[in-house]
Amino acid sequence: MIKRRKTREIDVGGVKIGGDNPVVVQSMTDTKTHNIEETLSQIKRLADAGCEIIRVAVPTEKDAEALKEIVKRSPIPVIADIHFSPRIAFTALESGIHGIRLNPGNINDEGKIREILQECKKKNITVRLGVNSGSLEMGILEKYGFPSGEALAESALNWSEFFEKVGFTKFKVSIKGSDVLQNIEANKIFAEKTDIPLHIGITEAGPAGRGSVKSAVGLGILLYMGIGDTVRVSLTADPEEEVKVAYQILQSLGLRRRGIEIVSCPTCGRIEVNLPEVVRKVEEKLDGKNIPIKVAIMGCVVNAIGEAREADIGLACGNKSAILFKKGEPVKRVSEDQMIDQLLKEIDNLEI
């Protein structure tokens, strides 16, 4: 059982973060935000996939002006992602957004940041304080020589202290870099010194395959340590894939459960069916079903039922047939050409 770090509770548009609340899954649109219909269409798809908070890029005034309509019609809370421009931040704050992401390292004006925080407090808007390895303050870079974990943590702690000194406490912090060990170290240092909620992620993780592995390693370690109140898996891929991978990581640690979990054996010389193809077909048929069960698809009967005893239902495939089992107990033998249909039928009949 993972003992999660105790953090203060905040909310973003009604979504509770920190405290005793579950880890929240976030993503970010890849549309031009001023293309309102396209952006909303993607937000709705992401919400259907399980995304609970969405961030949108706001690089221009045109994007900031589009936020009002997007916020009004979005099914989930919207965070405006602001870099460099306090002016755009103020425009965004007038739109009704639920949260704003600020990177003090590239705004670089304490007076303007103070004004933004005062406006956020007045409007009850949550802030995500983002510290990134690519935009550390020059003084910290000179002190450490490079964006080490200690450097990132110090920047985040300094800015957190600044936020609290101006009377603003409704914020969470993200400390991100593309280096996994650097990320872990920075978040660990920060987590040991504050009760501020942490948004975790490996930035610029890469394409879907490599990026998923990198994110699973980095986020998995942090989550196992109890660190992380919200999470985003950053991939060079469809944002819906980010949400899917995020839930898979959380599910593997027992922190969240969404959809059907499929477990299958790695195959060996004993198998007598095309197991990868069977698994692919089952996965395809079950995609989108939000039933909290575990399905096992095993390639032979040698250890299948014993190894997959924790599965709710499964197949142990053999020569031209398979044993269908539930909770580790054989139910019936089915023919190879009927085994997938029989499995799906039994899943539909399960009482959850």
UniProtKB/Swiss-Prot annotation:
| Cofactor(s) this protein requires | [4Fe-4S] cluster
GO molecular function term, any single one: iron ion binding
Co-factor binding details:
Binds 1 [4Fe-4S] cluster.
Q: What is its EC number?
A: 1.17.7.3
Q: Name one GO biological process term.
A: isopentenyl diphosphate biosynthetic process, methylerythritol 4-phosphate pathway
Keyword set, alphabetical order: 4Fe-4S, Iron, Iron-sulfur, Isoprene biosynthesis, Metal-binding, Oxidoreductase
Entries under SUPFAM superfamilies matching the protein: Enolase C-terminal domain-like (SSF51604), Nitrite and sulphite reductase 4Fe-4S domain-like (SSF56014)
Q: What pathway is this protein said to act in by its record?
A: Isoprenoid biosynthesis; isopentenyl diphosphate biosynthesis via DXP pathway; isopentenyl diphosphate from 1-deoxy-D-xylulose 5-phosphate: step 5/6
Q: Which reaction does it catalyse?
A: (2E)-4-hydroxy-3-methylbut-2-enyl diphosphate + oxidized [flavodoxin] + H2O + 2 H(+) = 2-C-methyl-D-erythritol 2,4-cyclic diphosphate + reduced [flavodoxin]
Q: Which residues bind [4Fe-4S] cluster?
A: 265, 268, 300, 307
Iron-sulfur as a keyword? yes
Q: Which family does it belong to?
A: Belongs to the IspG family.
NCBIfam families, per database record:
ispG_gcpE, PRK00366.1
HAMAP family in the cross-refs: IspG (MF_00159)
Purpose: Converts 2C-methyl-D-erythritol 2,4-cyclodiphosphate (ME-2,4cPP) into 1-hydroxy-2-methyl-2-(E)-butenyl 4-diphosphate.
What name goes with this protein?
4-hydroxy-3-methylbut-2-en-1-yl diphosphate synthase (flavodoxin)
